[in-house]
Amino acid sequence: MDPCKVNELRAFVKMCKQDPSVLHTEEMRFLREWVESMGGKVPPATQKAKSEENTKEEKPDSKKVEEDLKADEPSTEESDLEIDKEGVIEPDTDAPQEMGDENVEITEEMMDQANDKKVAAIEVLNDGELQKAIDLFTDAIKLNPRLAILYAKRASVFVKLQKPNAAIQDCDRAIEINPDSAQPYKWRGKAHRLLGHWEEAAHDLAFACKLDYDEDASAMLKEVQPRAQKIAEHWRKYERKHEEREIKERIERVKKAQEEQERAQREEEARRQSGAHYGPFPGGFPGGMPGNFPGGMPGMGGDMPGMAGMPGLNEILSDPEALAAMQDPEVMVAFQDVAQNPANMSKYQSNPKVMNLISKLSAKFGGQA
């Protein structure tokens, strides 16, 4: 595998650990399904991701966008993280080294031959012949690909050749075979140090010393640890500031939701009051309905002080169309207008909803005084 791709994958995994919501995007569905199919469990999305998923997008205000961008900019103290990069090199991009066939059936003869190759590799290594040592360790690995120390030894040579990615690949394989061996952690820590991966280097070197104390590993740990701690502190400050901003945003969202709820309640209350005011003739039209409606409500003379006691009212209220019209604010406004000034009837001659109700009332009460 291309070492650059491996580094990109490592960075992606680190990002997922810091923010699991990355895995809950639609683009990452295939990865979630694969992890779950292998028996793994995808961490739940962060609260922020859930809230963003459940919130409809609104057209942003340009001023607010500018303020948000400024708020998202880390302070100079946090953004200007200066780390001494002395000794850091560019990553190696050679083709992956031969790793052997882990499924091969190993005989005693092959194990003996692998051991001979290892001894020969150590001898040429002591003579400074690094590439020849790599070749001999590779031969030993192909003969016995399930011996962790062979990968660790070859990794040590890759570190000396300043090929940290190749060394990391060997150490990863050695740790898979024997996770209790200190050597792979030591050399992987040194490889990470060459790449400027201070946190990873500190972790591996510390773990190597924990498994089997080594002065060389301890000395390098003392070198990288302050840088790793500085980075960790930087991220703590950033995350703390990020969390504070999230809390403020959450408070603002709650406040806005409360205001929206209160506004909706006020509007609902206003609608109820409006409905009560223009409801089905409570207490009659103000001032009654003097005289006859112009334009034809025959026999509907006199005032209408109230409809509660009017004969036939229950029948009218049981008529769905009439009841719906009485609950229509537009119709009831028209009735109030006509009640105050019957001459205004002419304004509603072309309104079928108003005239339909008038026709029903005229038919029902036309002959009653």
UniProtKB/Swiss-Prot annotation:
Domain STI1 per the UniProt entry, residue ranges: 319-358
Similarity comment text for this entry: Belongs to the FAM10 family.
Residue list for modification N6-acetyllysine: 353, 360
Subcellular location: Cytoplasm
PANTHER family in the record: HSC70-INTERACTING PROTEIN, HSC70-INTERACTING PROTEIN-RELATED
UniProt keyword list: Acetylation, Cytoplasm, Phosphoprotein, Repeat, TPR repeat
Pfam families assigned to the protein according to its UniProt record, in alphabetical order: HipN (PF18253), STI1-HOP_DP (PF17830)
Gene Ontology CC terms: cytoplasm
Biased composition (Basic and acidic residues): 49-73, 256-272
Protein known as: Putative protein FAM10A5
Compositional bias (Gly residues): 281-300
Designated gene of the protein: ST13P5
Main location: cytoplasm
